[in-house]
Amino acid sequence: MSTARLFLTGIRTSGHHGANPGEKDQAQDFVVDLDVEVDVTADRIGGTSDYRELIRTAREAVERERFDLLESIADAVAEAVAARPGVVRATAVVHKPAAARSNDVDGVAAAATVEGD
């Protein structure tokens, strides 16, 4: 099998996540970066993972459920992306801009890596 890595960065989405009181009441902004290793043996779009579908899958994973931990969101995104056809491995980095601002840092993010089926 021949593989390549896709880097999909700055996927903007929103969700109801957080451990602090009130964080789940209103949707918050999240930004997802994906590093996805895909099977490219066939050299055709039908034989690998369409990056548009990977982006849609990442957004749906953030928007679908509610989590307390940023780490759990990253794991859910990586799991969902890794389950897509043609994916060998998926790493999701989920950024929470509001957490960075409230802590006076440049960024707050969590990452998770999951092997494909």
Language-model features and meaning:
Residues 1-117:
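N-terminal, polar/charged subdomain of small-to-medium soluble alpha/beta proteins
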